[in-house]
């Protein structure tokens, strides 16, 4: 298997050498953690995957959006393995305590829709629900980021084409 990026390498280590994954993880940056969380097919019953997600949530580059992405990946049924429920509850407690800052993140759930999706999933599960304060802050932050993305240069249009595409055209 060919590893082109750090997230690929971490994914490979998790499958082939889980003993080395913990040693390599501290060298990953925020974007690489986000990519790993979003692209890996996580196994909710595999102890090494649960430990890796716990390690990612303890990483200094982890933020609110990566933690929310982890929660969406591992959201437990009431009959789930106690280790899975413990991980999810721990993440919710840390999110509600304001442990992780809200900043720009590569995770696609950085949107009001992603926050609302988690809110719907956690209905009737108070131990897994985000506090009202956290929800309102997350919705406001996601809306602010969405507004910024619409006006960012990379999303601006000129003659029906994105400006970044026009800037990359080769002109003779």
Residue ranges and their predicted role:
Residues 1-172:
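Alpha-helical scaffold segments
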